[in-house]
Amino acid sequence: MEYQIIELSKEKWENTLIPIGYTTEEYYNITVEKKADGFVMEMKKQSFTQPVTHTPQEYDFPDRLYEPHWEKACARGIVQDEKLMAVVETAPEEWSNRLRVTELWVDESLRGKGIGHALMETAKEQARREGRRVLMLETQSCNVNAIGFYLHEGFTLIGFDSCCYRNNDLDRKEVRVELGWFLQEKK
């Protein structure tokens, strides 16, 4: 079956819940060690003692389309019978000439069919068309499957925030990880 990616208008899709959740058996353990001459940081994949599940409910359903703080956001996705089945939302970061993927989600029934890749390609094309330096996104150090997908898509680690969600993110093994895909600079 072929799926068509369409523009999702703000008027129709604003505030639509994106039910992002996952179960993981692994995480990237991030350590930061202060040294006399600076810091040493390490991000190394490790296993949980038992699977960990994160649900939208535990975070009070934070992922929605066209949130007010994402100025000039745009969304594209797949809709079947008026139901959202997959989506990518992007928003420009004008001051740094970067484009941020604010949401990426594919319904479980459609995973493994290349839809995530196709959605990411639309974001990459938007970044190229707008002349952005970087396409970037946020995920969590415990979302190993997502990190693997993004690395496969050509993204690389550009940073992390060790207290984005709570003050003990490092201990909880849920650290905000920033990944970026760099566009080729014109010579």
Spans of model-derived segments:
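Conserved phosphate-binding and hydrolysis motifs of nucleotide-dependent enzymes
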Residues: E82, A86, G114-G116, G154
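Conserved acetyl-CoA-binding loop-helix of GNAT-fold acetyltransferases
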Residues: E103-V106, G112-R129, G148-H152
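Acetyl-CoA-dependent GNAT
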Residues: K10, T16-R98, T102, D107-E108, ...
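Generic detector of contiguous secondary-structure segments
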Residues: Y3-T16, R132-I147
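Residues that form or flank phosphate/diphosphate-binding pockets in enzymes
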Residues: S96, G114, N145
